[in-house]
UniProtKB/Swiss-Prot annotation:
GO terms for molecular function: hormone activity. It comes from the Eukaryota. Neuropeptide H is the precursor molecule for neuropeptides C, D, E, F and I, which arise by incomplete proteolysis of neuropeptide H. It holds the Pfam family Crust_neuro_H. This is Neuropeptide H. The keyword Hydrolase does not apply. It comes from Cardisoma carnifex. One of its GO terms (biological process) is neuropeptide signaling pathway. Transmembrane segments: none annotated. Keywords: Hormone, Neuropeptide. Residues 17-36 are annotated as: Disordered.
Length: 36
């Protein structure tokens, strides 16, 4: 399920990158799923 979650997160990040107008959302996603 980790792989599935990662794929979903990657898709979300890609979408945010396309319309990088909500850094807050990106910050929340990073906090919820720290890649570090």
């Amino acid at each position: 399920r980790s792989a599935d979650g990662f794929g979903r997160m990657e898709s979300l990040l890609t979408s945010l990158r396309g319309s990088a107008e909500s850094p807050a959302a990106l910050g929340e996603a990073s906090a919820a799923h720290p890649l570090e």
